[in-house]
Amino acid sequence: SVKVVYAQYMYGTTGLLQMPIAEMQRDKTLMFGGSALSPQIIPSQEWWGNYYTINYYINVTIFPWLEIGYDCVLVKAKPGIYHWVPSTYGKFVNQDRSFHGRLRVWKEGWWKSWTPQIVVGLNDPTSGSWEGGSSSDDQRYNGFFCRYYVAATKHFNFEKVGELGIHGAYVWNNKNVHHFNGPAIGANFRFSLSPTSFINKAVNNLNLMAEYDSKSINCGFEYSFWKDYINAVVELNRCKYFSGGLVFKIHLK
C-alpha cells in the first residue's frame, strides 16, 4: 500500500492543503511540525494583520479511528488590539491556541470495494472563551480557526504509476468572519514508479495536491525526504500565495 503523509500544516492535522479529507495516519503516529503562514490564509486580518506568521503543532493518532491535535499560531502586537504597549508593536508577543479532532466513522472498502472512507472532524471548536468564543463574529475574538466537517475519500491505484485520491467534504462554521458553509473537493496523486533508477525513487516521494476548499482554489505538494518521517509541504493559496512547512513523524507502534 502507498504510505500516508497528508499533513495539513496550518491546522496540524491530516488533510490536504486547506480542505479536510478522510485519510487517517497509521495507528499510534505522533506528528509534529511548524510552518510559515501567508496572511492570505490567516482567518483574521484585524487580529494578525498583513504579515507572515509561524505556527507549530503536535498531533497523535490515538487509535486507527481517532486523531487529536494541538496547534499554536504566533501573533504580533499591533495598535488597538489587546492593550499591547508601543514598544512591542511588530513583535511576536502572543499565540492563538486551538485543539483539533478527527473521527473515522467508516473505513474505505468496509461494505463494498467502491465505498469511500468517511471522517467527521472539528477544528478549534470551543477554545474561544473570550467574548463569545468560536461562534462570535468579531475578528478579535477567539475560535479563529473554527470549522466542522464531514469528509469522504476514495483511492484509485494505477499499477507501477501511482495512487489517485479523490476527496469531498462539507465544511461549516457559524462565523461571519472566515465563514464556511459549503462543499470542498480535491485530489492528490502519489507516484509509485518502478524503483529502478534514482529519478524514479525521487519522484516516488512526491505527493501532488489540488483543491477547492469551499473558499479558494489551491495547489501544492508534499515531499518525503526520509520515508514519511521528515516531510515538506508547499502550498500556493489561490495558486499564488506561498505557505509551507516541515512535518515530522514518529511511529510509536
Could you describe each region identified by the protein language model?
Residues 5-148, 153-159, 192-198, 206, ...:
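Transmembrane beta-barrel domains of Gram-negative outer membranes and organellar outer membranes
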Residues 37, 73, 123-125, 169-175, ...:
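Active-site beta-loop-alpha junctions enriched in small/polar residues
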Residues 87, 226, 251-252:
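Flexible, surface-exposed loop regions and adjacent strand-edge segments
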Residues 98-103, 185-187, 238-253:
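Outer-membrane beta-barrel "beta-signal"
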Residues 143, 178-180:
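Short, solvent-exposed loop/turn segments at conserved positions within beta-propeller repeat blades
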Residues 161-169:
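Alpha-helical interaction elements
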Residues 183-235, 245-247:
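Outer membrane beta-barrel transmembrane domains
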